[in-house]
UniProtKB/Swiss-Prot annotation:
Stored InterPro entries: Nucleotide-bd_a/b_plait_sf, Ribosomal_uL23-like, Ribosomal_uL23/eL15/eS24_sf
UniProt keyword annotation of Manganese present: no
Species for this entry: Alcanivorax borkumensis (strain ATCC 700651 / DSM 11573 / NCIMB 13689 / SK2)
Role this protein plays: One of the early assembly proteins it binds 23S rRNA. One of the proteins that surrounds the polypeptide exit tunnel on the outside of the ribosome. Forms the main docking site for trigger factor binding to the ribosome.
GO cellular component, one term: ribosome
Protein name per the record: Large ribosomal subunit protein uL23
Database matches in SUPFAM superfamilies: Ribosomal proteins S24e, L23 and L15e (SSF54189)
Gene transcribed to yield this protein: rplW
GO biological process terms, semicolon-separated: translation
Gene Ontology terms for molecular function: rRNA binding; structural constituent of ribosome
Lineage: Bacteria, Pseudomonadati, Pseudomonadota, Gammaproteobacteria, Oceanospirillales
Keywords: Ribonucleoprotein, Ribosomal protein, RNA-binding, rRNA-binding
Protein family according to the UniProt entry: Belongs to the universal ribosomal protein uL23 family.
Source organism, top-level taxon: Bacteria
Amino acid sequence: MNQERILQVLRAPHVSEKATVQADQNNTFVFKVAKDASKLEIKKAVEALFEVKVEAVRTANMKGKSKFFGRVAGKRVDWKKAYVSLAEGQDIDFLGAE
């Protein structure tokens, strides 16, 4: 996998209350990923970018919410979420604090 595709696969870390609990208790991190990304691509991208060992990847397709923009009804875009489980002793530090 080339460097350009690695950067396209992982969009951003997904920060939520559930994601924080998963990271603390299960050593599982949540990412927003490209809709066409496979589990193998996600695994390789995380291992290359963060230099960690990935044990498992689970994905979920999230449907965009219906919203009103003024009086006009609209819909947010659909997106894909990946739960990445790391090997024991591995960690990802998003903040870079030491």
